From Swiss-Prot:
Assigned keywords, A-Z: Aminoacyl-tRNA synthetase, ATP-binding, Cytoplasm, Ligase, Nucleotide-binding, Protein biosynthesis
One GO molecular-function entry: serine-tRNA ligase activity
Signal peptide: none
Functional note: Catalyzes the attachment of serine to tRNA(Ser). Is also able to aminoacylate tRNA(Sec) with serine, to form the misacylated tRNA L-seryl-tRNA(Sec), which will be further converted into selenocysteinyl-tRNA(Sec).
Assembly notes: Homodimer. The tRNA molecule binds across the dimer.
Family: Belongs to the class-II aminoacyl-tRNA synthetase family. Type-1 seryl-tRNA synthetase subfamily.
Gene: serS
Source organism (scientific name): Mesorhizobium japonicum (strain LMG 29417 / CECT 9101 / MAFF 303099) (Mesorhizobium loti (strain MAFF 303099))
One GO biological process term: seryl-tRNA aminoacylation
This protein's name: Serine--tRNA ligase
Length: 434
């Protein structure tokens, strides 16, 4: 959530930021004008309430003076005034809550402001290559896509998955099931033992306010799955970013404890409401998938350096797996709602003859912290400031499995197991059809 004081002082800058995110000039200007009007109405009302409270306090003292001087008529008149003010304040406090909610609701649908060095663009075609790692091999005529290989091995079953759950689900078996588990364990071990992340096993169902904190709600409600719980509901996490980031919600962290670095391997659940017709075959876009998430909580001075570090941690996964990839700087029009800057890591898939996203690493500034009320103590201990939050995939496990299958496939239909995964698979070197 953006700072209303910043908006008040920089309305033109916000209009320009929204335009960079592909808002029309008219929509951006009217939105900012509406926000400022809501803010002014709230501030005027609060000022009026404060004036009434001051008058009530003064009148209460005057009642005592009138009683002591024997002026009963004045005392009664003042008592009536105090009673009227009390009623006004009670109604006014309810109105203040309404104005607060209206302002918060308006702020909640505004995206974050991109950093100055983010390339301006409309969509993925305007993203910029940061660097390329690994050589893309010449495509052989026998190369297949992951689902063709998996089905031929008898270890990837989409038909039975559809019988169980419908479309966009997969049943993995035998060697491929074992390799997906190995990939997740390898990633966790790398991030915890070498990259300094603390492993967490979080809840997979969370409250609405937690989803609001990491900006899934209200904007992306249709992408989520919910289950009834008591008189309300719980949402299934679309990413472990949600519970990991919210670990610091409504807390004040000591400065010397920062940065906090968390990682988790969890299933993720997404309705893929906006993805009809995209990647309908295979495992690329699923309702349920495993992902290793990286989350960092930093002070306001360290977040940009932490963003570079986090991205390098995610890239290291692909380097160890010896998979070709490229890292992209997302343009303003393709960047996520809560991000100030995002790097997408795209792994090479020979079967598709294309790079596909496997990780997205974003720095959010204090955007999520304001929604969560997550702060830290200043170095001097005199004040509290909002933390900065970062999140990234370290990486998507299912997509890493896809990349391994396609890049390590052999002409006979077998899949060579990357060296780094073999200790997790009992020394096995190859997956073959039974």
């Amino acid at each position: 959530m953006l700072d209303i004081k910043w908006i008040r002082d920089n309305p033109k800058a916000l209009v320009e930021a929204l335009a960079k995110r592909s808002w029309s000039a008219g929509e951006a200007q009217s939105t900012v004008d509406d926000l400022i009007a809501r803010d002014e109405a709230r501030r005027e009302h609060v000022t009026e309430l404060q004036t009434k409270q001051e008058r009530r306090n003064a009148a209460s003292k005057e009642i005592g003076n009138a009683m002591r001087s024997g002026d009963a008529a004045l005392a009664e008149k003042l008592k009536a005034e105090v009673g009227d003010i009390k009623t006004f304040i009670q109604n006014g406090e309810a109105r203040e809550r309404e104005l607060d909610k209206a302002l918060t609701d308006a702020l909640a649908v505004l995206p974050n402001v991109p950093l100055d060095d983010v390339p301006v663009g409309k969509d993925e075609h305007d993203n910029v290559v940061k660097h390329i790692v690994g050589k893309v091999p010449t495509r052989s005529n026998w190369v297949k896509e992951h689902f063709e290989i998996g089905e031929a091995l008898g270890m990837m079953d989409f038909e039975r998955a559809a019988k169980l759950s419908g479309s966009r689900f997969t049943v993995l078996k035998s060697g491929l099931a074992r390799m997906e588990r190995a990939i997740g364990q390898f990633m966790l071990d790398l991030h915890t033992t070498e990259h300094g992340y603390e492993e967490v096993i979080p809840p997979l169902m969370v409250r609405d306010e937690v989803l609001f904190g990491t900006n899934q709600l209200p904007k992306f409600e249709e992408d989520l799955f919910f289950t009834p719980h008591g008189e309300g509901r719980l949402g299934l996490i679309p990413t472990a970013e949600v519970p990991l980031t919210n670990l610091v919600r409504e807390e004040i962290t000591a400065h010397e404890k920062l940065p906090l670095r968390f990682t988790a391997l969890t299933p993720c659940f997404r309705s893929e409401a906006g993805s009809a017709g995209r990647d309908t075959r295979g495992m690329l876009r699923q309702h349920q998938f495993y992902k290793v998430e990286l989350v960092s909580i930093t002070d306001q001075d360290s977040s940009l350096a932490e963003h570079e570090r986090m991205t390098q941690c995610a890239e290291e996964v692909l380097k160890r797996l010896e998979l070709p990839f490229r890292t992209m700087v997302l343009c303003t029009g393709d960047m996520g709602f809560g991000a100030r800057k995002t790097y997408d890591i795209e792994v090479w898939l020979p079967g598709q003859n294309a790079y596909r996203e496997i990780s997205s690493c974003s720095v959010c500034g204090d955007f999520q912290a304001r929604r969560m009320d997550a702060r830290y103590k200043d170095k001097d201990g005199k004040g509290n400031r909002f933390v900065h939050t970062l999140n990234g995939s370290g990486t998507a496990v299912g997509r890493a499995l896809i990349a391994v299958i396609e890049n390590y496939q052999n002409e006979d239909g077998s899949v060579t197991i990357p060296e780094v995964l073999r200790p997790y698979m009992g020394g096995l070197a190859k997956i073959e059809a039974k």
